[in-house]
Amino acid sequence: MRRKVRRLTLAVSALVALFPAVAGCSDSGDNKPGATIPSTPANAEGRHGPFFPQCGGVSDQTVTELTRVTGLVNTAKNSVGCQWLAGGGILGPHFSFSWYRGSPIGRERKTEELSRASVEDINIDGHSGFIAIGNEPSLGDSLCEVGIQFSDDFIEWSVSFSQKPFPPPCDIAKELTRQSIANSK
């Protein structure tokens, strides 16, 4: 009996302790000073950039020619991105195009700043963004990602090699980005 009372007391104490936190999350519609009221309607739409064709309008052949990797397979192809892998396997070089609609480029840049050797501003054909370089001790600069902002959207090309020799990854990423910008509508 004593155990049951103690358990009940602990449960009630826990609920009492959690009540202020849960109550703070309620949508009571209270407009008292200090309450946060959104300045725009919840259903307001963002400003979208141009339309990008599948794979950024870049062909499998172009990716193969620029990367100089034979046997590339487009293993993921949909309306917002594509991924090319050597022989279709996860080991080895990989290349990808991604189109982020209504997503902040700043969050992606921050992730890059935390995980890459360097991240710099870039402008390609009048469009601003970032270029991130990743390196491996045995390979040097083997990864390059270019993200370019378009209103509330952004695109990103990622080029990553896994063994030498390979062409400069940032030259490839910049050229693929240029082609995608040219193919946008």
UniProtKB/Swiss-Prot annotation:
InterPro entries: DUF3558
Disulphide linkage map: none
Bilayer disposition of the protein: Lipid-anchor
Lipid-acceptor residues (N-palmitoyl cysteine): 25
Lipidation (S-diacylglycerol cysteine): 25
Region of interest called Disordered, as start-end residue ranges on this chain: 26-50
Predominant subcellular localization, coarse grouping: membrane
UniProt xrefs under Pfam families: DUF3558
Protein's cellular compartments: Cell membrane
Keywords noted in UniProt: Cell membrane, Lipoprotein, Membrane, Palmitate, Signal
Record has RNA-binding as a keyword: no
Signal peptide interval: 1-24
Keyword Cell membrane: yes
GO cellular component, one term: plasma membrane
Official protein name in the record: Putative lipoprotein LprB
